[in-house]
Structures are given as C-alpha cells and as structure tokens.
Amino acid sequence: MKILVTGSYHSGKSTMIRSLTKGKSISIDKQDTTVALDYGLVNIEDLRIHLFGTPGLKHFKVLRQVLSKGADGVLFLVDSQDKNSDVEAKIIWGEVQEFLPGVPITVAANKQDLPNAREVSRIRKDLDIPPDVYIVPTSAKTGQNVEKALRVLLLVAVQKELNLLKIMQKHDGEVKGIHSLMSDLGMEMGAIRQHLNWLELRGYVEVDWRTFIYWLTPAIKKVIEQPKLILKEFSVHEDSIKEV
C-alpha cells in the first residue's frame, strides 16, 4: 500500500516517517528542509506500507501532485502549536482533494508535546475538517500515537474495500474463480483484470491468469475476518465527532 504523508511546512512529516520506520527512512533535504521527498517502509499486520513524504513549501505543488499518484491513503499532518501554519495547511488540504478525490484521509494533530498545542476539537474547527475524518493527537518527536495514526488510516482504507474483498473471498483459490467474480460483480474481463492488477500491486491478492485463479493473501484474509485487528490495542471512539 502507498500512503502519502503530507501537510504544511515544518508540520513534522520527515520526523513522522523516521519515527514510524524506527529511523530507517530516506530523506532528500537541504538545511533540514525536505526539498523532494521522504520515503520509508513499514509492515503492519503483514501488510507492506510504503510511506511517501512530501515537501511542505507552497511552490512544490507539482512535486506533491506527482508523489500523490496511486496513493491509497493520506496521513495529513497539522502543526498543533502554530496556528499561523493553518493557511498553508488549508491550501495543501485543497490539493489533496484535487489530486486524490475520495481517497481516505486521517489527520495527525502533531507536536502535541509542545506547550500551547491545540486540542483536536480546536484543530477541527480551525481547519474546517469534516466530521467523518479521524484526527489523532500525535508527537512525531516523542513517538506519541504515531503508529496509532497510521493504523487508523489503514483501517479506513481497508474498510473502503471490505465489501469487495468479502465477495472475492467466496471464490478465493477456485479454478476459474475470476469468471465467477465477473458474474457476481457484473463486470467485463477488462475491468476485472484492471482491478485485480490494482489489488495485486498492493499485496491484497495473487493472481494466476493462466487458470483464472486468484488467492487473497494471508494478511488480507486476517484483516477481512477481523478488520479492527489493525488497531491492535488502540481504541477508536466513533462518537465525539470522530476524534481519536
């Protein structure tokens, strides 16, 4: 899976990726400012998660657009302490809606370790974040809730595909199961091929086009059966306007 880590300038994107990868990330920067991208790889419940961090300066819009291509989810960082950064945050939020319409987003209200950090409810109001978007209070510097924020995003992303995956489970490992899936979904071969290729690229399935068999990967089977397993020991409260 590809996750875009974005947000305003100095919101903590590079530090977030370093924290999630335990320091095993790559950054292209100049004088402590990301000028191209950050990259890291993590495994959560056997799902391989590719993290791509974007530069935050406004004039890097084209690069953010390139990096966003093919993203399955967006971890959007907000500087909880610096209200002046909200103007840039709103601009980049608009870019996300433009580049990745309909793609799941989770907000990390970052820098919660600093004095005068805003509460989640204040950030939601200041940035006009929709009530169906989770906001997780984090500190990339201390590691507070960084894994939780990513896991919440993964849960939202997987749940988006859950109905389809449950239908696919019926024909998992079945000879000519792809034909059965076509019938169930009312889709032509071209559309099915495109969708299965998309799922295979993300590590959800393995496909043998000679026999028209597909197999859901063990990791995704586990998630289908227990989707909230992704959240591990974390709790997510559905009430209180989706604040975490």
Task: Label each PLM-derived region with a short phrase.
Residues 60-82, 95, 99:
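Inter-motif core of Ras-like GTPase G domains
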Residues 157-179, 183, 244:
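Short amphipathic alpha-helical interface segments
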Residues 46-61:
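Switch II (G3) loop of P-loop NTPases
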Residues 1-50:
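Conserved G1/Walker A P-loop phosphate-binding module
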Residues 218-244:
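Short, amphipathic alpha-helical interaction segments positioned at domain boundaries
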